[in-house]
């Protein structure tokens, strides 16, 4: 049987995500809401205020503006760097071999993402255009790729592959826009010296890649120091994760085409030493173990540091970082939101995500196709596009993150609480209406196919 070796495109990997990670994210969010609105609320807030400290040589590593980080700050300023490191690796893969690897492929998802960022901001500002509440205008810009794909997966194998590809590429382009917004608008009091040191370490990482250094431990250590100096520089630390990801080399030590030949030669060199066996127990000879270890090293060399790091980070992000982030940030206090306040930030976020986001994605995409600037995506109808645009309105993770940046500090706590409410309601509406719309379209197509 003929076999071929190739990169597993990130689009394929992301669209086959295990649902368990998304379920953990959902359950962590529900737990946070329950605790924040019950007799456990005091315990919940005490957990978030728990100090996290690590002292090395008299220096507090996890300190924020000279103060020891709380668990909430640790999650948002440290653990989310790991999330954005993983996001950066996915973006790099998309640019290299995925749906953003050529101008023709990338144009439509990027156009859709731009529309999905501009229009939600306009809808937000129509409702809240002045005062401290307007600081959250960027909140409805983001799409939560995990929840969006989970909503798409509800309809099973009937969903055309082109829809999954377009939605994933759209979300990746959306992430790029979100990262730029964080870098430009959520950084203050920039320390040029610290920033210069951070970029110096990034340059060292780049040189390591050029010199074919494949030791992941070295890249993780460098990333830690890049984060540390970004923390002191005034630029938000999540940008450190993205920039570090771009420095991780995508070139493997052994080309995949040569892997089979290397493995065959090692397999042929396997000594015919007697294998000692007792029941289900097997004892290999030292020579056999040496050959098997050589096979392991050769196989590892065939995977680039970029993909290897992404494989390591994926379960950590999915099963630890994002659920903990959701638990720390999703605890909206429903009793603190008044009926009058619903027409402020909550409505602005809701309209931005549920109305502005889908309309922006749909009309920018459809407009470019009608102007013949881009070809229509294969296998996608106008109703399909509207459904995918609705899934783009599922904000959640990154929207919550931008909300915490927009309304930082005790004086903005009420706005933060209101923004969370808007994110929750809009994401649920977008998911439900998107599923209903796509199900209707798929049933319509199925009925037409049966008639013909």
Swiss-Prot record:
Q: Which InterPro entries match?
A: Na/H_antiporter_dom_sf, NhaA
Catalysed reaction(s) here are: Na(+)(in) + 2 H(+)(out) = Na(+)(out) + 2 H(+)(in)
One Pfam family, short name: Na_H_antiport_1
Subcellular location, in the record's words?
A: Cell inner membrane
Q: Name the domain of life this protein comes from.
A: Bacteria
User: Primary place of residence?
Assistant: membrane
Please provide the record's keywords in A-Z order.
Antiport, Cell inner membrane, Cell membrane, Ion transport, Membrane, Sodium, Sodium transport, Transmembrane, Transmembrane helix, Transport
Mind telling me which residue stretches traverse the membrane in this protein? 23-43, 71-91, 108-128, 136-156, 165-185, 189-209, 216-236, 316-336, 349-369, 385-405, 418-438
Q: Is Cell membrane tagged as a keyword?
A: yes
For the biological process aspect of GO, one term held by this record is: regulation of pH
Q: Name one GO cellular component term.
A: plasma membrane
Provide a Gene Ontology MF annotation, just one.
sodium:proton antiporter activity
Q: Is Cytoplasm tagged as a keyword?
A: no
Tell me how this protein sits in the membrane.
Multi-pass membrane protein
- PANTHER family xref list: NA(+)_H(+) ANTIPORTER NHAA (PTHR30341:SF0), SODIUM ION/PROTON ANTIPORTER NHAA-RELATED (PTHR30341)
Query: HAMAP family in the record, alphabetically?
Result: NhaA
What protein family does this chain belong to? Answer: Belongs to the NhaA Na(+)/H(+) (TC 2.A.33) antiporter family.
UniProt-recorded name of the protein: Na(+)/H(+) antiporter NhaA
Q: Which organism is it from?
A: Porphyromonas gingivalis (strain ATCC 33277 / DSM 20709 / CIP 103683 / JCM 12257 / NCTC 11834 / 2561)
